[in-house]
């Protein structure tokens, strides 16, 4: 969507058009990958890579972060709304193909991307003004980081949530170590290890989203959010509550994991990934065996790092989690499985990654310890 406006000097006198030009000037700085607009006293961010499912790039991060900082201090900005362009995605994740290419070439992007992404995620998690993420469509990885730490996350029937990183030799980062262990029971660990996908109302039911609103009402909701006068967190919550009450779609449909919740809590209550796999195989139910089959496809290294990440993150502050995850990100950049996972899933698309080590037993506790160890002066500082 182009915001370039050609107009005569006479037409420039229109206040409305001047505001639109101001919106264009703000957006063009980001090379159109992300658009910024002031609508009244609302700051609106649009992730604008619809053909790439709004995948997050370093360029986008480097424009969103200072804009959020500016709006946070601006007395003329009362609320921030973030959304994705197009019908398919809010944000399908980070631009991991670019990160993999940079890492292979020894480019600093593989360090800088994660560092700046986590700093942005932390800014969202500590934002003082109402922050509303309209997560309509695919919301995975980096897209979760742009939404889940904010005060309000609005899912629709089109929302598709997952943290699929163990399947590409990574781990559920962007603060996954904070929000996942705080979901009910062992659900967060289950989602982290298996990459299980949640859709629509279920995203709100588990707490990843704060509200569920039918997609046909999102445009109206955004207008009403913009029209709020100096809104408090409570004012925004009341408006979102009212829209949720009017959204009856799938209300009678049971939670997709309703019948498996007890089994998840029981089978994933274990001291190691190996023990979880053993529990699943011993259980023998169709659900348990399917999860065992899923785990067998994932990077053994990623599974072990993720298990420890969720375990440690349950006792950490959000800032401590980001520091831990930055260490893990760099361990993955220095390893084998991330590059192999990206090759198998995104480049060659043969879906047959050759993990090294290829078994859980091959990933030693000493190696895992090393991945969590300090990077000294290269540690993330928040």
UniProtKB/Swiss-Prot annotation:
GO molecular function, one term: 3-hydroxyisobutyryl-CoA hydrolase activity
Enzyme class: hydrolase
Record-level GO BP terms: valine catabolic process
Naturally occurring in which organism (per UniProt): Danio rerio (Zebrafish)
Binding residues annotated for substrate, in chain numbering: 117, 142, 165, 173
The protein's name in its UniProt record: 3-hydroxyisobutyryl-CoA hydrolase, mitochondrial
Top-level division of the source organism's lineage: Eukaryota
Record key words, sorted: Branched-chain amino acid catabolism, Hydrolase, Mitochondrion, Transit peptide
Xref: NCBIfam families: PRK05617.1
Gene: hibch
Similarity field: Belongs to the enoyl-CoA hydratase/isomerase family.
GO cellular component: mitochondrion
Function summary: Hydrolyzes 3-hydroxyisobutyryl-CoA (HIBYL-CoA), a saline catabolite. Has high activity toward isobutyryl-CoA. Could be an isobutyryl-CoA dehydrogenase that functions in valine catabolism. Also hydrolyzes 3-hydroxypropanoyl-CoA.
InterPro entries, alphabetized: ClpP/crotonase-like_dom_sf, ECH_dom, HIBYL-CoA-H
Pathway: Amino-acid degradation; L-valine degradation
């Amino acid at each position: 969507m182009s915001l370039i406006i050609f107009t005569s000097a006479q037409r420039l006198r229109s206040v409305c058009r001047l505001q639109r030009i101001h919106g264009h000037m703000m957006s063009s700085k980001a090379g159109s990958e992300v658009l910024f607009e002031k609508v009244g006293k609302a700051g609106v961010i649009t992730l604008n890579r619809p053909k790439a499912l709004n995948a997050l790039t370093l360029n986008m991060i480097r424009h969103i972060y200072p804009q959020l900082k500016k709006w946070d201090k601006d007395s003329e900005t009362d609320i921030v709304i973030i959304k994705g362009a197009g019908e398919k995605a809010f944000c399908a994740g980070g631009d991991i193909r670019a990160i993999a290419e940079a890492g292979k070439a020894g480019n600093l992007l593989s360090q800088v991307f994660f560092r700046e992404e986590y700093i942005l995620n932390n800014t969202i998690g500590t934002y003082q003004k109402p922050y509303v993420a309209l997560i309509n469509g695919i919301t995975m990885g980096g897209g979760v980081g742009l939404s889940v730490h904010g005060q309000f996350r609005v899912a629709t029937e089109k929302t598709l949530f997952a943290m699929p990183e163990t399947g590409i030799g990574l781990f559920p980062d962007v603060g996954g170590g904070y929000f996942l262990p705080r979901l009910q029971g062992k659900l967060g660990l289950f989602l982290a290890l298996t990459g299980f996908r949640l859709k629509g109302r279920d995203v709100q039911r588990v707490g990843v989203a704060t509200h569920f609103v039918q997609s046909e009402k999102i445009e109206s909701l955004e207008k009403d959010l913009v029209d709020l006068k100096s809104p408090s967190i409570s004012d925004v919550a009341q408006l979102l509550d009212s829209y949720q009450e009017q959204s009856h779609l799938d209300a009678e449909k049971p939670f997709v994991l309703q019948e498996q919740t007890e089994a998840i809590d029981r089978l994933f209550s274990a001291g190691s990934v190996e023990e979880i796999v053993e529990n699943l195989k011993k259980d023998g139910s169709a659900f348990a065996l399917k999860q065992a089959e899923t785990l067998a496809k994932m990077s053994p290294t990623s599974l072990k790092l993720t298990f420890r990440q969720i375990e440690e993150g349950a006792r950490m502050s959000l800032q401590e989690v980001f520091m831990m995850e930055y260490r893990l990100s760099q361990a993955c950049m220095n390893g084998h499985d991330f590059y192999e996972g990206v090759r198998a899933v995104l480049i060659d698309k043969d879906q047959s990654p050759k993990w090294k080590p290829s078994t859980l037993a091959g990933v030693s506790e000493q190696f895992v310890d090393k991945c969590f160890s300090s990077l000294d002066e290269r540690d993330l500082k928040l």
